Amino acid sequence: MTAETEAVTTGEPQVTERKHRKRLSEGARAERRLGWMLCAPAVVVMIAVAAFPIFYAIWLSLQRYDLRFPNEAKFIGFSNYGAVLSSPYWWHALWVTLIITVVSVAVEFVLGMLLAILMFRTLFVRGTLRTIVLIPYGIVTVAAAYGWQYAWTPNTGYLSALFNNSAPLTKTGTALAVIILAEIWKTTAFMALLLMAGLSLVPEDLQKAARVDGATAWQRFIRITLPLMKPAILVALLFRTLDAFRVFDNIYILTAGGNGTYSVSILGYDNLFRALNLGIGSAISILIFICVAIIAFIFIRLFGAAAPGTEG
């Protein structure tokens, strides 16, 4: 009797626990269904807006379609992709794009983190400081690019005058440096804003406890602040990297892609709107889309485990 009673009494909590888990599971499923229902309208609109251009671009990339000879359009399969990938122009454009992306995003991350910490820690004139920092980001990119172009114009530009009327936009290396500088000046504030939001996720109690334990400011930053900021870092780096990889306006205004400064977006634009070759231009666009998808996948794999709502 004792054994049976023991079995019964030890079995009841297990049954109750299983029922409780089942109820939680049903509640979680209901919450998930509600989430999908709330997201569905936006997803439908996004698919309607984005799906047709994407599939139409894929279809064009499989055609020999030159607007100068529209009657000669025909299906040629993946020949356009072969032509693009075997062209030195594509690989040069990809190399230039990667240089601009890696350098600008790396510098923006460091400067953005410093600005984020400064804005987050500043108690006085915090609103004024944030407004000043965000001014460059609020300026239209084309207008800012024309400002940079004027500043580096020999005999008239103030920055050119500081360097003995130099003309950096006429040489590949210095032109890329000016383009990267324009990118950094424009979008560091965006990076700082996202990282500052991440700083608010770090509990002050942890910082105080680490300070009491004798941890230095650098140790607290490396072992507490950065790990807890990973979700914000993912968003900041992902958004900014994808934006930098598609760089177009600064290059178009400053150099128009001349002197070997053309990016993959400039190359696609030239083929689509100047050469009127929709087949090659669409193939370049799809390759850019694939590169962007690969970059997004890499970032999510590297930082995704730290994002809210993910496990392990």
Predicted regions and their residues:
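N-terminal signal-anchor/first transmembrane alpha helix
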Residues: M1-L62, R68-S79, P88-Y89, W95-V102, ...
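Membrane-cytosol interface at the C-terminal ends of specific transmembrane alpha-helices
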Residues: I47, Y146, T172-R211, L237
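Glycine-rich helix-loop "coupling/hinge" segments at transmembrane-helix boundaries
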Residues: R64-L67, N71, T170, V247-L276, ...
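Generic hydrophobic transmembrane alpha-helix motif, especially the helices
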Residues: E108-V110, L134-S166, K230-D243
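Membrane-interfacial helix termini and adjacent extracytoplasmic/periplasmic loops
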Residues: A145-W185, D249-Y262
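Non-cytoplasmic
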Residues: N155, T188-L194, A232-G257
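Short hydrophobic alpha-helical segments within the ABC transporter permease transmembrane module
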Residues: L194-G198, R220-I233, L237
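Glycine/proline-centered hinge or cleavage motifs at structural transition points of membrane proteins
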Residues: D213-G214, P227
